Design a protein with these regions (language model features):
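C-terminal motif of bacterial Sec signal peptides marking the signal peptidase cleavage site
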Residues: 18-20
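Short, conserved, GDST-rich strand-edge loop motifs in beta-rich repeat architectures
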Residues: 160-178
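Beta-rich, blade/repeat-based domains predominating
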Residues: 56-72, 98-117, 121, 140-158, ...
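Bacterial signal peptide processing site
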Residues: 22-24
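Beta-propeller domains
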Residues: 73-94
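Short loop/turn segments immediately following beta-strands, especially the blade-tip
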Residues: 227-235, 321-322
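A short loop-to-beta-strand structural motif that recurs across blades of beta-propeller domains
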Residues: 82-84, 121-123, 183-185, 223-225, ...
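A short helix->beta-strand "capping" segment at the edge of beta-propeller domains
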Residues: 38-58, 239-242
Length: 322
């Protein structure tokens, strides 16, 4: 497959981050040095050239995105409460500490990132960690649960999931849900709207290339669901089951599905369940890449759009595409 095959997807998945303390960037050698040891490409030999560890020594990595303005990746260490940037060479830069438990991110057309945080906020920031601004922390006057992952449409509409993970111990405070449900939300023209509240643990989210379908992973049911955006007229709509993920042969820790990305050919790359599953637009499995631990998320990017940054437990990996 040609490198240009994935180039469009690389531009469409980013964000920066977050919250309160710690301005200024700092180049560091944080994290252990890259082993650069090649790993299994599983059954994805037609798509993948190589999988290799880029850096380790973190707590729980999440929220990868490519920053095209600085030609580097941005990602979160959720439980380390820190946001990092990392160059393709492995050079690590600390962007923000005591950051608000940042999680998923996605890139807006103006080059800023939308960042979901487990401190119950949705924010924007630049790729260098500056310009932090709050977007939303409430819906209908009540606190959000813990914004988890983000996708941005071609018109800069923002879609995010709001499961309870951050208020169940994976954030700064334990609390009851103010709404009593986990939501999938849309932010557009300064307004926040509820798309769906039927999933108990909505996690990853990604929009289709034609902008008509939202893919949502529900960790607790091991499934991915679709939401028809053309049906949304301001009132929550139902979701339909798209695929159920099975554990990956040779993969390690096998939690339910997590982060999602849609490639330029419409295939869905789903993390979790011991690695990454690549699905066709009809939900059929194309291939799988095993990883030793649960994969929390992935993002297309790189200088030529032919790389993926994978976040998994205490490490980040690169996947080089054919």
């Amino acid at each position: 497959m040609r490198r240009s095959f994935f180039a469009n997807a690389a531009v469409a998945a980013g964000v920066v981050l977050l919250s309160a303390c710690g301005n200024g960037t700092q180049s560091t050698s944080d994290g252990e040095a890259s082993s650069n040891s090649a790993m299994s490409i599983g059954s994805c030999g037609d798509l993948v050239k190589e999988v290799a560890e880029l850096k380790d020594g973190f707590n729980w990595t999440e929220g990868p995105a490519w920053d095209p303005s600085l030609n580097r990746w941005v990602f979160s260490d959720v439980m380390g409460d820190t946001e990092y940037a990392i160059a393709p060479s492995g050079e690590l830069t600390t962007l923000r500490e005591k950051a608000g438990y940042p999680n998923g991110r996605a890139l807006l057309s103006n080059g800023t990132f939308v960042v979901a945080q487990h401190d119950r906020t949705l924010n924007t920031a630049k790729g260098n960690g500056e310009g932090f601004a709050l977007l939303f922390d409430t819906y209908e006057g009540k606190k959000l649960n813990s914004p988890n992952d983000v996708s941005v449409g071609s018109d800069d509409s923002i879609y995010f999931t709001d499961p309870p993970f951050g208020i169940q111990g994976f954030g700064p405070e334990k609390a009851e849900s103010a709404h009593g449900f986990s939501g999938v939300f849309k932010v557009s023209n300064g307004t926040i709207q509820l798309l769906n509240k039927d999933l108990a643990t909505p996690n990853g989210v990604a929009i289709s290339n034609d902008q008509n379908t939202l893919y949502i992973s529900d960790t607790g049911t091991n499934s991915i669901y679709t939401l028809d955006l053309s049906r949304f007229q301001g009132v929550p709509v139902t979701v339909e089951k798209f695929a159920e993920l099975m554990p990956i042969d040779g993969g390690g820790e096998s939690h339910g599905p997590d982060g999602l990305r849609v490639a330029s050919d419409g295939s869905i790359w789903a993390s979790g369940k011991g690695g990454i599953n690549v699905l066709k637009s009809d939900g059929a499995l194309t291939c799988s890449i095993p990883f030793p631990n649960h994969v929390s998320n992935l993002a297309f990017g790189g200088m030529y759009g032919n790389e993926i940054l994978v976040t998994s437990a205490d490490k980040v990996y690169t996947v080089n595409l054919k």
